[in-house]
């Protein structure tokens, strides 16, 4: 989530950068689940984008949420740009085009994720409905051009907007037109981090297919099942992708630091101001060679903020962030944490998942990742269709959740949250393929019904 960190301690050594990541190590008893989801606001009348300004704008929506929740406002130059729950740790923030993001508090079970989600959606509806605002659960806006989409008043996004066209074809589409759901999970040691990172990077295309949900652009079928995932293939390859070096000997926190040091920066924040340093490396900044800050060393805040501008398919911070899934309607959202918790928080399933992926080489992993946005379940790796691998992974996740045996107050375990994925596997079609069937059938070639059927 794009919320800036504040720790102005100057950094003296590379070891401090490594230690910042290593501080994420925690005992298994303290493992938590974090879920972040984005949703696109639209006007209930006319299905248009919602501006920031005005009595029915996104700023007004955030003001209403502040009064309802009592959360701390996050302000920038007099504008409310988010909310933070000081006690629980959750937050609401804005993506560049007004996509409304809930960063959930760290919770112990997927049941709690679902409860938090339901409470959040009820609260959002209470404020949004009188303002005439609805929210869409797709991976990409289905009908609007980029030019139609408003720009949120956040300094970091202005810098990114200027920089993106220099480094890729689709960066502005990523910023302004896409939505995701992400799951954040813990690790118990450096070795545990490496194993979970490798498994989740290799299998991220499985999640992309299971959640593929962005087949429309500007009112037409775009030829992809997850155009959002395709967008990431040409956004900024210096900071995204399948990080093949993570599978090499010697992978650990230090290797991630070396990678991050050479990822081009976007900005440095000083006070309320964002200073544009786009394209310069953190390594030069660390060595006192940034022309905007001559002889000045970065702070821990600068490091934490820089790490939040790196976008591989799985991101390491003080936890691992699964980044491959499209945004989906509310009833499918808990299925993403359920999938990854079942695979990564159970040792038997984690070992079995690694057995699936450990013999794939970097070229095979990359080819699968490149094919999945267009072909979904019909993408292939070696002699297998991705559908077969996805079916196996959902089965492993189910078994992992069953062994976890975390029960809700009705005595049900977390496997029930996998039901949307099991239905997808039984149907043999991705969510995008189901939507395309509607588009070519009952929707009669219009995407407008999506604003009803896929709304929150």
Predicted regions and their residues:
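Solvent-exposed residues in well-ordered beta-strands and their adjoining turns
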Residues: 42-44, 105, 186-188, 325, ...
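Long, well-ordered mid-to-C-terminal structural blocks that present hydrophobic/aromatic surfaces
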Residues: 280-364
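Loop-rich catalytic cores of soluble enzymes, especially ATP-dependent carboxylate-amine ligases
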Residues: 129-130, 134-315
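Terminal catalytic/cofactor-binding subdomain
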Residues: 1-169, 177, 332, 336-341, ...
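Conserved aromatic-histidine-acidic binding/catalytic patches
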Residues: 27, 109-112, 116, 184-188, ...
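Short, intrinsically disordered, mixed-charge
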Residues: 67, 126, 202-205, 209, ...
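Structured core elements
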Residues: 40, 101, 182-186, 321-323
């Amino acid at each position: 989530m794009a919320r800036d960190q504040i720790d102005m301690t100057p950094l003296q050594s590379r070891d401090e950068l490594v230690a910042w990541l290593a501080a994420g190590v925690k005992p298994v008893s303290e493992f938590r689940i974090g879920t972040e989801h984005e949703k696109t606001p639209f006007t209930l009348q006319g299905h248009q984008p919602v501006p920031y300004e005005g009595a029915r704008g996104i700023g007004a929506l955030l003001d209403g949420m502040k009064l309802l929740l009592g959360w701390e406002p996050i302000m920038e130059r007099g504008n409310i740009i988010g909310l933070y729950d000081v006690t629980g740790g959750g937050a609401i923030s804005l993506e560049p085009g007004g996509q409304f993001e809930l960063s959930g508090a760290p919770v112990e079970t997927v049941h709690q994720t679902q409860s938090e989600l339901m409470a959040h959606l009820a609260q959002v509806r209470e404020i949004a409905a009188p303002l005439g605002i609805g929210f869409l659960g797709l991976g990409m806006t289905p009908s609007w051009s980029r030019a139609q989409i408003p720009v949120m008043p956040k300094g970091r996004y202005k810098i990114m907007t200027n920089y993106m066209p220099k480094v890729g074809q689709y960066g502005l589409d990523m910023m302004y037109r896409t939505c995701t759901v992400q799951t954040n999970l813990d690790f118990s040691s450096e070795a545990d981090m490496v194993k979970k990172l490798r498994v989740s990077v290799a299998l991220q295309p499985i999640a992309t297919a299971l959640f593929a949900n962005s087949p429309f652009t500007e009112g037409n079928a775009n030829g992809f099942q997850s155009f959002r995932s395709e967008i990431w293939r040409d956004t900024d390859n210096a900071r995204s992708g399948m990080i093949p070096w993570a599978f090499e000997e010697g992978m650990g926190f230090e290797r991630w630091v070396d990678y991050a040091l050479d990822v081009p920066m976007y900005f440095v924040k000083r006070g309320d101001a964002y200073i544009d340093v786009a394209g310069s490396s953190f390594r030069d900044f660390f060595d006192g060679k940034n022309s905007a800050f001559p002889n000045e060393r970065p702070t821990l805040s600068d490091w934490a903020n820089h790490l939040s501008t790196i976008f591989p398919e799985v991101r390491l911070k003080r936890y691992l962030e699964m980044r491959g899934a499209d945004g989906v309607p509310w009833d499918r959202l808990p299925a993403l944490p359920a999938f990854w918790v079942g695979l990564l928080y159970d040792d038997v399933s984690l070992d079995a998942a690694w057995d699936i992926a450990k013999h794939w080489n970097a070229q095979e992993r990359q080819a699968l990742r490149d094919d999945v946005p267009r072909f979904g379940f019909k993408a292939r790796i070696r002699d297998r269709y991705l559908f077969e691998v996805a079916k196996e992974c959902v089965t492993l996740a189910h078994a992992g959740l069953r062994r976890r045996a975390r029960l809700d107050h009705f005595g049900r375990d977390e496997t029930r949250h996998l039901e949307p994925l099991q239905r997808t596997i039984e149907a043999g079609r991705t969510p995008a393929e189901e939507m395309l069937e509607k588009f070519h059938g009952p929707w009669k070639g219009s995407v407008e019904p999506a604003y009803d059927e896929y709304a929150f």
